[in-house]
Amino acid sequence: MSDAQRTGLLIVDLQNDFLAPEGAYARGGAVSPAALALPARVAPVAQAVKAAGGLVVACQFTLWPDAQGEPMIAPHLKALRPFLRRGDFQQGAWGHQHVDAILPWVDVSVSKVAYSAFFNTQLDWVLRHAGVETLAICGIVTNGGVASSLRDAHMREYHTVVLSDGCAAFKTTTHEASLADMGTISEVMTCEAFTRQLSAQH
């Protein structure tokens, strides 16, 4: 396998309920403006990873319904996002789906219930069986799902790359501080630089 074929891309939480005008976060007035630019920026990276023979994984934040059909929401999230309601981020629903821009390039979808895409999921199993050694990570938010997933990948001894302009937070200062923090354990590259490096390895 080439280095490119041992490369995986993890796209964190680019879902309709987070980003679409009809989604849950738009309804609650909680969409990150910087995040709206990500699908168009990330899709070419996913396409390049696929073309090079790598694996594209996209995770989906999931709210599972209880016996009465109400979403089981962690207390801290319920306090932070009181607008979340029945049907939001529910598996199989439109809001739970990946945004259209990335759909054609996703090989594997992983449902998650917490910040990290590794927590109580089969992501590590999938990556190892696919031969992935280098994992590039992008999505939302920089200081939440992206940072948590990256640190869990680092602890599992993957070589990690965070795509600096492929992720976003609610505040620029938070985004930049999180990138600087992740830079102590990971490579930090722009989407363009990563794609260029991938092409050279292919």
Descriptions of predicted regions:
Residues C59-T62, I140:
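Short, well-ordered beta-to-alpha junction loops that form the rim of enzyme active sites
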Residues G8-L14:
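N-terminal nucleotide-binding beta1-loop-alpha1 segment
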Residues Q5-T7, G23-V49, G54-L55, F61:
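A short alpha/beta connector and helix-capping loop motif
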Residues V57-A58, A136:
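A structural signal for short, well-ordered beta-strand segments and their strand-loop junctions
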Residues M1-G8, P44-A52, G69-I73, K78-H202:
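Active-site-adjacent betaalpha module
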Residues I11, A58, V162:
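Short beta-strand "acidic-cap" motif of Rossmann-like dinucleotide-binding folds
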Residues Q15-A20:
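Short acidic, Gly/Ser-rich segments with clustered Asp/Glu that frequently serve as metal-coordination loops
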Residues P21-E22, G69:
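Short, solvent-exposed loop/turn and secondary-structure capping segments
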